[in-house]
């Protein structure tokens, strides 16, 4: 008699092995070629700040556009392959132009490749050497204090938005820092980062993107840090905080926006299921303060993330009570 269940399990193992082997290269291909130029047009009041970080032992470059004295901020976080010259939101979208005179200060930290914008256990050692990653401390303590003191930006009642790697980071930052971030946007994120083989896949992707090790970040897969940084497991915190959420993930099918390539299609389809699970967890915890866009066509590419950032602008302005500027 044929052991059908055994064959299914074997095929499942092979599929997982195949996914683990190909995921890093797919992420690399979907991310596109690096560029040294920014999108923002000349004339926009974009500043290039150097913000001191005691936690990281160096100054961090931050691209910044002021929304006015006392304005709330929108922190835009980059993907796994974040560069050290410009934030990906400026390289790949016209975010500064879209949000010009919106009443929202736009804050784009630069760098943090493979960081998950987290406080790492150990030095972040990769192909370029070792550095200190204490991004959560920087984003939730050092940077808001500096912006408040030096640019009159509100240190509370703000928003954090991220794509891919940083989508889950945005939710986690809002879960643990609810006074600062009353709004969190997650675009095409992996939402079950501590479950199954996800820690191994994340480690492989981080190794491909800079030679980093996931164990230096959150320890072995059974370490509590993995659960702390898992959006599905922290959905209840977001509900308890009444954080306003904007959660997007395409289904892996390209639309007229583009992003028609196998890596981008595969990756979006790969993370889509975890977004549905997050929605279930959020609803199951009694959540009622979220926008979920999970049914539309879309791939793992900037065309869709830019469209979402543009679409959420009125929602951000309303939630953060921004006062648009004129002139």
Swiss-Prot record:
Stated family? Belongs to the mycobacterial A85 antigen family.
* Protein name as catalogued: Diacylglycerol acyltransferase/mycolyltransferase Ag85B
Renumbered to this chain, the signal peptide range is 1-38
Which molecular function term from Gene Ontology is one that the record holds? trehalose O-mycolyltransferase activity
UniProt-annotated stretches for the region Fibronectin-binding: 96-106
- Keywords on this record? Acyltransferase, Disulfide bond, Secreted, Signal, Transferase
List ligand-binding residues for substrate: 80-81, 164, 192, 270-273, 277, 300-302
Give the EC number(s) listed in the UniProt record. 2.3.1.122, 2.3.1.20
Chief location: secreted
Source domain of life is: Bacteria
Keyword Secreted part of the UniProt annotation = yes
> What's in the GO CC field?
extracellular region
Per the UniProt entry, the disulfide pairs are: 125-130
Gene3D superfamilies listed in its UniProt record: alpha/beta hydrolase (3.40.50.1820)
Provide the species name. Mycobacterium leprae (strain TN)
- Quote the subcellular location field of this record: Secreted
The answer to whether the entry has keyword Disulfide bond is: yes
Q: What does this protein do?
A: The antigen 85 proteins (FbpA, FbpB, FbpC) are responsible for the high affinity of mycobacteria for fibronectin, a large adhesive glycoprotein, which facilitates the attachment of M.tuberculosis to murine alveolar macrophages (AMs). They also help to maintain the integrity of the cell wall by catalyzing the transfer of mycolic acids to cell wall arabinogalactan and through the synthesis of alpha,alpha-trehalose dimycolate (TDM, cord factor).
């Amino acid at each position: 008699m044929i052991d059908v269940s055994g064959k299914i399990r074997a095929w499942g193992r092979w599929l997982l092995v195949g996914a683990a082997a190909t995921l890093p290269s797919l992420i690399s291909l979907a991310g596109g070629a690096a560029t040294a130029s920014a999108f923002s047009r000349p004339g926009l009041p974009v500043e290039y700040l150097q913000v001191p970080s005691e936690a990281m032992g160096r100054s961090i470059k931050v691209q910044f556009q002021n929304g006015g004295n006392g304005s709330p901020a929108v922190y835009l976080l980059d993907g796994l392959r974040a560069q050290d010259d410009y934030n990906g939101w400026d390289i790949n979208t016209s975010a500064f132009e879209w949000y010009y005179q919106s009443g929202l200060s736009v804050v784009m930290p630069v760098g943090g490749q493979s960081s998950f914008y987290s406080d790492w256990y150990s030095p972040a050692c990769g192909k370029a050497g070792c550095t200190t990653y204490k991004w959560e401390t920087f984003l939730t303590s050092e940077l808001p204090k500096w912006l408040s003191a030096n640019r009159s930006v509100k240190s509370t009642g703000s928003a954090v938005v991220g794509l891919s790697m940083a989508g889950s980071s945005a939710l986690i930052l809002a879960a643990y820092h609810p006074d600062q971030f009353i709004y969190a946007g997650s675009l095409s994120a992996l939402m079950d980062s501590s479950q199954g083989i996800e820690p191994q896949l994340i480690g492989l992707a981080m190794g491909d993107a800079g030679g980093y090790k996931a164990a230096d970040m959150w320890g072995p897969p059974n370490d509590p840090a993995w659960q702390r940084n898992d959006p599905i497991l922290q959905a209840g915190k977001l509900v308890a905080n009444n954080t306003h959420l904007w959660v997007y993930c395409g289904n892996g099918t390209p639309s007229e926006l583009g992003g028609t390539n196998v890596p981008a299609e595969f990756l979006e389809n790969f993370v889509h299921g975890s977004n549905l699970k997050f929605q279930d967890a959020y609803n199951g915890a009694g959540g009622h303060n979220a926008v979920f866009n999970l049914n539309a066509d879309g791939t793992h590419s900037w065309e869709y993330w830019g469209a979402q950032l543009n679409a959420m602008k009125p929602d951000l302005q309303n939630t953060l009570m921004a006062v648009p500027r004129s002139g």
